[in-house]
From Swiss-Prot:
GO terms for biological process: L-histidine biosynthetic process. Pathway: Amino-acid biosynthesis; L-histidine biosynthesis; L-histidine from 5-phospho-alpha-D-ribose 1-diphosphate: step 1/9. It comes from Halalkalibacterium halodurans (strain ATCC BAA-125 / DSM 18197 / FERM 7344 / JCM 9153 / C-125). This is ATP phosphoribosyltransferase. Its EC number is 2.4.2.17. It catalyses: 1-(5-phospho-beta-D-ribosyl)-ATP + diphosphate = 5-phospho-alpha-D-ribose 1-diphosphate + ATP. Lacks the C-terminal regulatory region which is replaced by HisZ. The keyword Transferase applies. One of its GO terms (cellular component) is cytoplasm.
């Protein structure tokens, strides 16, 4: 039986995804979360885990170095990679929002600029809204942009809204709810269909059970 390679995003999603896999009966070592290795083999399950930046997970899966992966819907929409999205894991729920300073008024914004680490997603959203904006790509600390005059608004992930409040920003528009998804390489799905189908079925039972 060939090894199944799983790409996992480092950070909050990783911890929740590992918990989900354990609930689904996968025997993952207790020190798994504390490991600083980027590649972790689990011989008991004949699985290999690749720990990557969230934005890179779909790339690893698309190119076949990982058979399956866990990725946020925000990353999927931004990256638009050639992968199958097979299951909504319903973990790490948050939402994408447009935010800005409390006194922001769209009608007075003659040269609208929006900062985001999701330039493609933001561009599509504002186009659908019939609004022409200049998108400025940032890789972090997006909330800084309106405070220093780089942009009037931002598009970013919101979990509790605490970061916005602490930086004096307010939510202007809620764009969409985001959860993490199980994604699969199309070739792997054909070559390792039994193992992948088994994983999907086991995870589905946990997801539906938790949601009951």
């Amino acid at each position: 039986m060939s090894m199944l390679t799983v790409a996992m995003p480092k950070g909050r999603i990783f911890d929740e995804a590992v918990g989900l896999l354990r609930k689904a009966g996968y025997n993952l070592p207790a020190e798994f979360e504390a490991s600083r290795k980027l590649i972790v083999d689990v011989p008991e399950e004949n699985m290999r885990f690749i720990l990557a930046k969230p934005m890179d997970v779909p790339t690893y899966v698309e190119h076949g170095v990982a058979d399956v992966g866990v990725a946020g819907k925000d990353v999927m929409l931004e990256e638009e990679r050639d992968v199958y999205e097979v299951l909504d894991l319903k973990i790490s729920e948050c939402y994408l929002a447009v935010a800005g300073l409390p006194n922001y008024e769209k009608k007075h914004d003659l040269n609208p600029k929006v900062a985001s680490k999701y330039p493609h997603l933001a561009t599509r959203y504002f186009k659908e809204q019939g609004e022409q904006v200049e998108i400025i790509k940032l890789n972090g600390s997006i909330e800084l942009a309106p405070l220093i005059g780089l942009a009037d608004r931002i598009v970013d992930i919101v979990s509790t809204g605490r970061t916005l409040r602490e930086n004096g920003l307010v939510e202007l528009e809620k764009m969409m709810t985001i959860t993490s998804r199980l994604i699969v390489n199309p070739v792997s799905y054909r070559m390792k269909d039994e193992r992948i189908d088994e994983m999907v079925e086991r995870l589905l039972q946990v997801v539906e059970g938790d949601g009951a």
